[in-house]
Amino acid sequence: MTKQASRFKLGRNSTSLALVFGILAAAGSAVAQSPDYKSPSPAFTEALAAFDAAWAADGLAFSAVTFTDGPGSGYGKYTATENNVFSAGETIALYAEPVGYAFDQSQDGYTYKLAASYRLMNTSGQVLSEQSDFAEFTGTTRSKQRQLSASLSFQFDGLPEGDYALEATFADQIGNQTAGFKLPFTIQAAN
C-alpha cells in the first residue's frame, strides 16, 4: 500500500510541476514573441508611406544607367567607364538601377519580377542583334526590395569599328509595364 500511495503522491507532484513549468514557458514564449525595440517616429513612418505612394505612382524608371568596368557587385557597387569607347571583341558591361516596379504580396513576403531584353543598333537605327527576356531579376523578401541593381554583359564578336547604340528594355512582369534606355558607344580597332 505504501508503495502505491507514494507513487500517487509523486504523480500528483509531477503534474503540479509540469503545470508550473508550462505556465512559465508560456509567459517566456509571449515575451520572446514581442521583441523590445525602438519604433520609427511618426514622421519617418509618414515619409515612408509617401515614398511608397510615389514609387507606385511613378511607374518603372531608372535612377542610374551607365557602362561599367566589369559587372557591378551589388546596389551602387560599380565603377563607371571613363568613356563609351570599347575595343573590338571587348566585353561591354552596363549597370542599371530600376525603380518603380510593382510587388506581389503573399504570406512569403513581397515578390518583384523583371525581365530584360536588348537591341544592338547602328547609327541609322538598323537592328544588328536582339534578344527578348535574356535576363531575369526576381526575388521575394519580407520587406519591399527597393535597392535592385542590374548588371548586364554583352560580347559582340565581329562588330566592325564605328558608332552604335545599345538599347535595353525592362519589363515589369507583375506591374505589366516597361521602361528602357539607350546608351551610345563606339567600337575601335583592338590594339
Where does each model-flagged region fall?
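N-terminal secretory signal peptides that target proteins for export/translocation
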Residues: 1-12
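An N-terminal domain-start capping segment
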Residues: 11-16, 77-78
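Bacterial N-terminal signal peptides
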Residues: 14-27
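Sec/Tat signal peptide C-region and signal peptidase I cleavage site
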Residues: 28-32
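Intrinsically disordered, low-complexity terminal regions enriched in Ser/Thr/Pro/Gly
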Residues: 33-191
